[in-house]
Amino acid sequence: WTSFWQSELEFHISDKEDTPLDWEKTEFQNQVQIFDFENFAAALYFSYNFVTENSEGDEIEYKYLNELYNDELGLITNFIFEKQVGSRAGGSTTFDLSNYFYIKELFFELIDFGLIGFSDFGEISKFRVFGEQEHQYGFQLESGFELYDIDYEWAIGYLHGLTDASANHTII
């Protein structure tokens, strides 16, 4: 972290009904903060996702993030746009939404707990019907520490699929 920029590395592992445990993608993202007021912040994200599923191309992802927070609670909402790239790319830009409601320092005054959810509505040019959309919701634990003037954060979570198109279980 700096006062306005951070980078993250995420690993997405899922368990769909008809497949074994699957390493879905590895995501490298950068965040640039637009503003940070006392209880409200916004940022832009850019990420490149290395997709390991055979039938899909890698992804370029853009996000706009809003965060409302105080000393005890927070709510983060992301508006996400993804476009597949590479030789296996297909389709137009997709629209996703994610929400994360968290309670700060709930466990041992050092681990945050939150309810987290992701919704994939489909391509911007044609949203899918609800049963064909991907919706996963669950919980997440996270914490952080500082080492040699650098902030490090970790998070782990579980998501449960709500539609047939969603992975049944995902660890994030």
What do the predicted segments below correspond to?
Residues 1-171:
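Transmembrane beta-barrel domains of Gram-negative outer membranes and organellar outer membranes
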